[in-house]
Structures are given as C-alpha cells and as structure tokens.
Amino acid sequence: MIQFQRLHKSYTVDGRQIVALHPLDLRIGPGEVFGIIGHSGAGKSTLIRLINRLEEPTGGRLLIGDEDVTALNSTGLRALRRRVGMIFQHFNLLSSRTVAGNVAFPLELAGTPRAEIDARVAELLARVGLEQHATKYPAQLSGGQKQRVGIARALATRPQILLCDEATSALDPQTTASVLQLLAQINRELGLTIVLITHEMEVIRRVCDRVAVLDAGKLVETGPVTEVFLHPQHPTTRRFVSEAEHVDEAELHRDFEAVGGRIVRLTFLGNGTYEPVLGRIARETGVDYNILSGRVDRIKDTPYGQLTVALTGGDQNAARAGFVAAGVHVEDLRV
C-alpha cells in the first residue's frame, strides 16, 4: 500500500513560491496498476518522483506499507530505492555498456556476487524477450527494445513497486502496445504494484485498474478506470476521454439537429456488451431507434460498448427504464 497524506511540493523561484503539487490524499493498493494522467505541467512527474524521493516533498507524509518514506535517512533511502524500480521516457541507458551490462548495473552497485548477477541478467532478458541481444549496445536497438532493457534493469533488484514515468510517450503506437502488454504481464506474474504516468487516456484504458487525474497540480478525479473512463465527472477528464475516443462533442451535438426524437447515450459493460438489449427493448416498448454513433472496445480485460441513439415513437420512458433494469447506464443527451 502506498499512501499520500496531504503530500505537497512547492519551489521558490526568484523569491516567488511556485506550487507544483497541492496537498493531496491518495491510496494505491498492493498489486494494482495505477495510472496518473494529466497534461504537461499538471504535476504528475513530480508526484511519481516523490514516491522514491527523487523529489523532496515540501510537506505531508508518504507511506509505503507502514514505513514513512518522508522520514527516511540516507541509508533507509538507499534500501527503499532497491524496492522501487523506475523506467523513464528516454530510457536513460548507459551507452558504453551492453544490454546485459545495463541490466547488471544496479546489481553490481548492490555488491551482488558475479554468478548471481549473470543468472539474474539471463532470467530478465528472457522475460523481456531480449535474450538474443545481450551483447548489443543501446545504439544498436530500436526504441521499444531500449525500453525493454530499461524494464529489465528496473526489475533487477526484485522491487515491489515499479514506477513508469511516461514510459511509452517516445514510442510508436505498435511498440507502445507491446510494451504495455509486457507491463501487464509483469504485473500478473510478479504481483508488482505499478504506478504509471501518462498524458494519454488510451494508455490508462489498456492496462490500469484505477486512475487519478491531475490538473494544475490538483487531484481532480480518481476511481476505477471503468468508472472514470465511461462516466467522467471533471471537465479535464472528459477532454481526455474525448481525445481517446476521437469524439468531437460539439460536432456530435450539431449532428443531433438533423434527427428528431429523444437522444440517449447507452453504455454497456462486461458480458452485457454482447447482449441484444436494444432490439429487445425496442420490441417491448414499441420505440424506433436510429443509431447515431457506436463503439465496442475493452478497458483492460473488461469489454464495454457505447451507443448514441435517437428514440422516436412508442413508450420512451418505459424504454429508458428497461435499459436501466438491464444494467445499461443511460445518459440523456436530449429529452
């Protein structure tokens, strides 16, 4: 368990105090993949770097388990950083070392015996799919391969927590998907707590269990990804979701002017995504429907579907009640 208790961070620049992170309270459970999303300058990098004290907090407390990280001395901090691995946007590999040498580096610093280092490096390179590249140098690798080296290096000391600081933002979409798949696999197989920061809701949707949304250094929304993604409350969150779904809400509402009737957005979650609920309720209530937009996708391992439909004729109130009774979330866009 990672607990932020009124944790905050400020800087003094030219005699002025700049607040990077306002006091916040947050809990991250053991074994979770927890996402932190925000635009540039929102405070997300500051937040994640407070966990291993690459940034020093101005005030508040940070607990990992029962240990107060904010109270650790230098010896305790070194021990903490062996339990908290980190990967970075720009990989931060040592160009003069081979792939194997980069992965071995934290073990060498810890004074691990050579035979144990060699065995651990071989195990980790196999886990990230780079066993054939052990003797190559970073300059000979693709971006995705470099990030896999970074992941292997971060896992070398068998950490309990893995911090991912914009780990996929420098990668193309296909490589991003493969790295996210690897992180999800590591979470399942090793039970690691993963804290991931990003400015892309699509990354959150693919791998995270819960998410926190930051805006101008403030925590504005948090909850399970299914809830936050499908029913965003804060304007910042709604913008992230619209960008991820490539939906222009203003354009969509202009399209509404071309159709009559009551317009609703129906959200299906889990196995109900594949049930013929719309057709059944239309028959039962006598309503006609016009599908204006729709999609079926997944949030991590959970299928979901969304339909925007115009309802005409029949008993529309009964149809709405029928959708709710079937476990469908109904949002009235025009009554």
UniProtKB/Swiss-Prot annotation:
Pfam families: ABC_tran, NIL
Positions in coiled-coil regions: none
Subcellular location: Cell inner membrane
Membrane topology: Peripheral membrane protein
Binding positions for ATP per the UniProt entry: G38, H39, S40, G41, A42, G43, K44, S45
PROSITE patterns (UniProt xref): ABC_TRANSPORTER_1, ABC_TRANSPORTER_2, METN
SMART domains: AAA (SM00382), NIL (SM00930)
Domain ABC transporter: residue ranges: 2-241
InterPro entries given in the database record: AAA+_ATPase, ABC_transporter-like_ATP-bd, ABC_transporter-like_CS, ACT-like_dom_sf, MetN_ABC, MetN_ABC_transporter-like, NIL_domain, P-loop_NTPase
Keywords: Amino-acid transport, ATP-binding, Cell inner membrane, Cell membrane, Membrane, Nucleotide-binding, Translocase, Transport
Entry's Gene Ontology molecular function annotations: ABC-type D-methionine transporter activity; ATP binding; ATP hydrolysis activity
Assembly mode: The complex is composed of two ATP-binding proteins (MetN), two transmembrane proteins (MetI) and a solute-binding protein (MetQ).
Protein name: Methionine import ATP-binding protein MetN
